[in-house]
C-alpha cells in the first residue's frame, strides 16, 4: 500500500550523507529487487524529469533550496506512485524557484495522470496547480471547487 503513495516533505528530508543519486535511489533499493543498472536508469530518468540529471553526484549541502526540493520530488515519484502528497511545497522558496516548482507540479500532474494532494497555505499558488481545491477553516471544509469557482464565490 505504501508504495502507491509518494510524499514530498516540507523540508525535503534528504539524507545528508548520500548523494542526490543515492537519495533518489533509496526507495528503489529498499522496496524493490531491481538491478543496479535498472535503478540507475530509473533514477536518472526521474532526475531528468525535474531538470536535475546533471546533479546526480552532488550532495544535499551543494544544492540550493529549489534544487533540493526538486531532488525530493524526484525521490517522491521514483516508485511511480498513484497518489503524490505534497506538504507545503512552496514554503521558503525564492520567487524563481517557486515558479519552477509550481510549473513542475502542474506539468507532472498532467503528464503522469496521477492524483496529487497539495497541503499549502499559499492559496494563489494552489490555484495554478489544482483542478479542485478544498479550503479549510477551524478543521472543517469552508469551501471547495475549481480555482475559478472559488474566485467567483470569494468575489460575491
Task: Show which residues each predicted segment covers.
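Catalytic Walker B motif of ABC-type/P-loop ATPase nucleotide-binding domains
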Residues: 84-87
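Conserved catalytic motifs of ABC-family nucleotide-binding domains
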Residues: 80
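H-loop/switch region of ABC-family ATPase nucleotide-binding domains
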Residues: 120-121
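Conserved beta-strand-loop-alpha-helix hinge in the C-terminal portion
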Residues: 140-156
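Conserved ABC ATPase "signature" region
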Residues: 37-54
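Conserved ABC ATPase signature
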Residues: 59-63, 67
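A short, surface-exposed alpha-helical micro-motif characterized by mixed small hydrophobic
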Residues: 126-128
